[in-house]
């Protein structure tokens, strides 16, 4: 399954480049719930000190390689903690799957 390969490569690339600077990587949305379709994108929240431009380049590379769209959100740990009680963040934490 290309989606699983893309997710694994995405997480491994981030862990390799930003070792010690990533606090969480969470898969959320339809792939986390298991109700995805072939039209679904892969939603991932990255918490930590990560360069958003690098993430966009990585998403583009994986789109070209696997034909899979990864929709990544990057937040600092401080911002994530400020928003932790917002409904979006509660949903991500409740239904999401922690990848790292």
Curated annotation (Swiss-Prot):
Residues that bind Mg(2+) 2: 41, 43
Cofactor details (free text): Binds 2 Mg(2+) ions.
Residues involved in Mg(2+) 1 binding: 41, 43
UniProt entry keywords in alphabetical sequence: ATP-binding, Magnesium, Metal-binding, Nucleotide-binding, Nucleotidyltransferase, Toxin-antitoxin system, Transferase
One MF annotation (Gene Ontology) recorded for this entry: metal ion binding
Catalyzed reaction equations: L-tyrosyl-[protein] + ATP = O-(5'-adenylyl)-L-tyrosyl-[protein] + diphosphate; O-(5'-adenylyl)-L-tyrosyl-[protein] + ATP = O-[5'-(adenylyl-(5'->3')-adenylyl)]-L-tyrosyl-[protein] + diphosphate
Cofactors named for this entry: Mg(2+)
Function: Putative antitoxin component of a putative type VII toxin-antitoxin (TA) system. Its cognate toxin might be MJ0605, which it might AMPylate.
Family affiliation: Belongs to the MntA antitoxin family.
Protein name stated in the entry: Putative protein adenylyltransferase MJ0604
Organism this protein belongs to: Methanocaldococcus jannaschii (strain ATCC 43067 / DSM 2661 / JAL-1 / JCM 10045 / NBRC 100440)
